[in-house]
Amino acid sequence: EVMWLMEQVMWKSLDKRVAAFLLEEASIEGSSVLKITHEAIANHLGTHREVITRMLRYFQSEGMVRLSRGMVRLLDEDRLRQLQD
C-alpha cells in the first residue's frame, strides 16, 4: 500500500512536470512541434525514458499531444496548462 501511494504521488507530480516542460520548450522554440526524444525529456526531468514514454502515451490518449519518432506535437496546450497548475 505504501509503495502504491508513493507511486501515485510521484506520478501526479511527474505529469505536472512533464506538462510544464513541454509548454516551456514550446515557448522557447516558438513552435508546438518539439524535436526532442523521450530520452532527452527524461534526462531534463531526472527520470527514466520508460517513465516519460508512459506519461507521453497517456497524454496522447487524452488528445493533448501526438507522438512520432523524435518529435512531440502539442495538440491541446490549454489542457497541458491546466494540468501543470
Stretches found by the model and what they are:
Residues 1-13:
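A small-molecule sensor/coupling module
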Residues 14, 23-85:
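Phosphate-/nucleic-acid-contacting segments
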